[in-house]
Swiss-Prot record:
UniProt-annotated binding residues for NADP(+): 38, 167
PANTHER family per the UniProt record, alphabetical: NAD DEPENDENT EPIMERASE/DEHYDRATASE, NADPH-DEPENDENT METHYLGLYOXAL REDUCTASE GRE2
Species whose genome carries this gene: Saccharomyces cerevisiae (strain ATCC 204508 / S288c) (Baker's yeast)
Taxonomy of the source species: Eukaryota, Fungi, Dikarya, Ascomycota, Saccharomycotina
Database matches in Pfam families: Epimerase
Full protein name: Putative uncharacterized oxidoreductase YDR541C
Record flagged with keyword Transferase: no
Amino acid sequence: MSNTVLVSGASGFIALHILSQLLKQDYKVIGTVRSHEKEAKLLRQFQHNPNLTLEIVPDISHPNAFDKVLQKRGREIRYVLHTASPFHYDTTEYEKDLLIPALEGTKNILNSIKKYAADTVERVVVTSSCTAIITLAKMDDPSVVFTEESWNEATWESCQIDGINAYFASKKFAEKAAWEFTKENEDHIKFKLTTVNPSLLFGPQLFDEDVHGHLNTSCEMINGLIHTPVNASVPDFHSIFIDVRDVALAHLYAFQKENTAGKRLVVTNGKFGNQDILDILNEDFPQLRGLIPLGKPGTGDQVIDRGSTTDNSATRKILGFEFRSLHESVHDTAAQILKKQNRL
């Protein structure tokens, strides 16, 4: 039986870690990327592994975007991991840049599976987000508990006030579309659906060369604090985190384990604040002491009592593995950044 996995958005932060773990477990991987430049870079980075092939999908929101790939390779594919989705806040064209690409990209890949691989694809995993679960307006309410059953309450209209609200909602609409698709087409498809809903992502880039001056949104928080002058004020930011390596493993478990079928896997390992990150940086990296702010050491625990709570105990029970600690995740992220800057 085929052990081939299709991974959309193969050059993404999460997807690269997924590819690495799949190849280590001897899966055959077909990845989609947006350009021949990304294709060449990825093949080089994975040392032209014979189990990795790539296909070009320039725009996932374009009608029938995945038809060519599924028509060509669909008979080989047993599992599909759809990780491709826009992730940026710096836009004012919310429908064009966030809502429509996320929604249409998800619908497109599911329709292509239905057309060309309905008999061969057994499991589909969609990379969603905690933002599909969390309602922004309720994040600061300590009486609110978000779980695997929660949904972001934003509407198509109400979310279009800024990039953050629109991004949060885009993940909700894309995930909803996936669940609705499986329900409406249950007589025409073989696959079972699982979604993986991660929180803010920390952790190292898979390849050191991908550490640039500006990193993906979550890791840029750590990069930013590393480069914050010692006397500068630090924003009182708090949120929930997960390590990218754990998110990648959750994607594998999402199609490997029977008990994940039909589930939303909320992968997060609790709250953190900027003070927690500063404490780790100052404790673990002597070369940063006196160059970055101290803040108020040891007061990070105070964020635990603030704002809403995310209870993912059901997900933890299903997955059955321990998530990496904030300390490990921040340390590994910072160490890679400092190594690239010859400061380690």
